[in-house]
A protein has these predicted regions:
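Conserved small/polar residues in nucleotide/adenosyl-binding loops
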Residues: 344-346
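N-terminal leader/linker segments that initiate helical-solenoid repeat arrays
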Residues: 16-71, 75-82, 93, 102
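Canonical tetratricopeptide repeat
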Residues: 52, 86, 120-123, 154, ...
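Canonical positions in the second alpha-helix
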Residues: 39, 43, 72-73, 106-107, ...
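Start-of-helix register in tetratricopeptide repeats
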Residues: 48, 82, 116, 150, ...
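Register position in tetratricopeptide repeats
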Residues: 29, 59, 93-94, 127-128, ...
Length: 346
């Protein structure tokens, strides 16, 4: 009898533990994350339960707590790639791309052939604007796989971040030759063409892409902008209206649609879109300029005067600002030892 009681007492904690585990599993299956966190003891040392707790915290957007749990697991086992990736994702979701990159790099060092880890590492570097390190990482990728269109695409982004437009274009061009249907690559190439005022080239490359897909927002933005800059306002209006139908109500889409309507002599359409762009960025002088001119040609003529006056107030520095700028200029000349120029500006 004594042995039976002892055996029963030994089995009791095991039974309770199994019940708790079943409860946690059921709560996870039912997306009841609060219950999951509640059922797992604060001082729990079980790695599987802690991973489950971190997943529940992450699902509730409680990222700092999830990060704390995952870091405690990394201290126990720094080679667990699943925990490293979960930790990287939590850092990304808190906007800390640099720390996310560090986690992806550790996972990548553990599994050098894993393309996902390498891809996420480079993306995180680009997101954190560590362009030089991203460039180096891309070259490392391309040493392993010289045919990778994605590798060249991200190399182009790294060069863009480094303000090296020529190398960026060369990288995008190689990526495009390997995969001409990658929307991001097409949009980036078209963006460089537009920035260089090669608007016809931007139209050509985007129209080729549009033969297979007319719904990509990034490609259509560059396509529409090129038509607007070429003063083909009718086509630009169609493209920008299509973008709005796709849900794009960004500042630049509204601004360029307004400008295109203005160029196409539909001033009410120009007014409506420029007014919406103005509400998003009331300090933009270009928006105020076209909004004023559109207003003057519609029923809102007094508004037109007010908008143009506002543009003047923003564009022309006040007297006090000019005095401050001149004082600063004189000070800089003095420090540079250029007394003659300093006296001229006093």
């Amino acid at each position: 009898m004594k042995k039976f009681v002892t055996l029963l007492l030994c089995m009791l904690p095991v039974s309770l533990f199994a019940q708790v585990n079943d409860g946690i599993r059921q709560a996870m299956d039912n997306y009841d994350y609060e219950t999951v966190v509640m059922l797992i003891e604060p001082d729990c040392q079980d790695s599987l339960l802690l991973i489950t707790k971190a997943q529940a915290l992450k699902a509730m957007n409680r990222y700092p707590e999830a990060i704390g749990v995952l870091n405690s697991l990394i201290l126990k086992d720094s080679t667990n790639t699943k925990v490293l990736i979960d930790l990287a994702e939590c850092y990304k979701l808190t906007g800390n791309s640099r720390r996310a990159a560090n986690c992806y790099q550790k996972a990548m060092n553990l599994q050098p052939e894993n393309k996902f880890f390498r891809l996420q590492f480079i993306r995180s570097l680009l997101a954190s604007e560590d362009y030089e390190e991203a460039r180096t990482a891309c070259h490392g990728w391309l040493e392993r796989d010289s045919l990778s269109a994605t590798g060249y695409k991200y190399l182009g982004q790294a060069y863009e971040g480094l303000q090296d437009a020529a190398s960026a274009f060369l990288s995008y061009n190689i990526a495009y030759r390997r995969d001409s249907l990658d929307a991001q690559t097409v949009a980036r190439i078209a963006g460089i063409f537009n920035n260089n005022q090669q608007f016809k080239d931007a139209v050509d490359v985007t129209e080729v892409y549009r033969l297979s897909d007319t719904t990509n927002i990034d490609v259509n933005r560059q396509n529409a902008k090129a038509y607007c800059m070429l003063k083909e306002y009718g086509t630009a209006v169609k493209r920008y209206e299509s973008l709005k139908e796709l849900g794009d109500r960004s500042f630049l889409t509204l601004y360029y649609l307004g400008v295109s309507h203005y160029g196409d002599n539909w001033f009410y359409g120009a007014y409506d879109n420029l007014k919406e762009a103005y509400q998003k960025n009331p300090m933009d002088v270009n928006v105020l300029y076209y909004l004023a001119k559109a207003s003057a040609r519609t029923s809102w003529k007094k508004e037109g005067v007010e908008y143009m006056e506002e543009a003047f107030r923003i564009a022309v520095p006040s007297d006090s600002m000019m005095v401050r700028l001149y004082d600063g200029l004189v000070e800089c000349y003095d420090y540079a030892g250029d007394t003659k120029l300093s006296l001229i500006h006093i």
